[in-house]
Amino acid sequence: MAPRIPLPGVEDMNDAQKVVYDKIVSGPRGTLVGPLRAALHNPLLADCWQALGQVLRYETSLPPHLNELAILVAARHWNSELEWTIHAGAA
């Protein structure tokens, strides 16, 4: 099944997209997955989104394993299979 929004490959990114991509993969995430990848079509949106996500996931007062557990609790509550899949390994 083809994605609804074509996902940009690294080799096809323009300069602005590449800057945001490099920020994401060189940071604590280490990889680019999920809807943030589609957001790269708008580099400003993707950059703001990744910055907010980084603060919410990596810069809280909770220890990392409890932060991941909180994400899983929210994912389960909202039946978010994507969030569960992304975060289950880290919890």
Where are the regions that the model predicts?
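Conserved alpha-helical segments that form or flank metal/cofactor-binding pockets of metalloenzymes
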Residues: 48, 62, 66-69, 74-91
